[in-house]
């Protein structure tokens, strides 16, 4: 009979493996329960679309360029490009405070 020498390293590896296994099992159980609940509540639920090229959004539709979207500023009444909205609002709202 050969006995395995018990070292601190082997004990710590065993504890780590037990902790990781327990954590993984807990996460899998929670996610499985959540998926079953979602399928029960929303039977027609579709999962998000994944496009490896990055040209489609999560619904499988063509992405719109941010510069093609315009937002109406209620403060000054101008249409501002979506990618410039934050800078516009900062300028637009600070002008109103000076008056």
Curated annotation (Swiss-Prot):
Coiled coil: none annotated. Changing residue 86 to D: Moderately impairs deubiquitination activity of the SAGA DUB module. GO terms for biological process: chromatin organization; regulation of transcription by RNA polymerase II. It is found in: Nucleus. The keyword Zinc-finger applies. Component of the 1.8 MDa SAGA (Spt-Ada-Gcn5 acetyltransferase) complex, which is composed of 19 subunits TRA1, SPT7, TAF5, NGG1/ADA3, SGF73, SPT20/ADA5, SPT8, TAF12, TAF6, HFI1/ADA1, UBP8, GCN5, ADA2, SPT3, SGF29, TAF10, TAF9, SGF11 and SUS1. Component of the transcription coactivator SAGA complex. SAGA acts as a general cofactor required for essentially all RNA polymerase II transcription. At the promoters, SAGA is required for transcription pre-initiation complex (PIC) recruitment. It influences RNA polymerase II transcriptional activity through different activities such as TBP interaction (via core/TAF module) and promoter selectivity, interaction with transcription activators (via Tra1/SPT module), and chromatin modification through histone acetylation (via HAT module) and deubiquitination (via DUB module). The long N-terminal helix forms part of the 'assembly lobe' of the SAGA deubiquitination module. The C-terminal SGF11-type zinc-finger domain together with the C-terminal catalytic domain of UBP8 forms the 'catalytic lobe' of the SAGA deubiquitination module. This is SAGA complex subunit SGF11. The lineage of its organism: Eukaryota, Fungi, Dikarya, Ascomycota, Saccharomycotina.
């Amino acid at each position: 009979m050969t006995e395995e020498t018990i070292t601190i390293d082997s004990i710590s590896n065993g504890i780590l493996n037990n902790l990781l296994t327990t954590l993984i099992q807990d996460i899998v159980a929670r996610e499985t329960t959540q998926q079953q609940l979602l399928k029960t509540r929303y039977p027609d639920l579709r999962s998000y679309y994944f496009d490896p090229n990055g040209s489609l959004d999560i619904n499988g539709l063509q992405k719109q360029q941010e510069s093609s979207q315009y937002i109406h500023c209620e403060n000054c009444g101008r249409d501002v490009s979506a990618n410039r909205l934050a800078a516009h609002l900062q300028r637009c709202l600070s002008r109103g405070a000076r008056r």
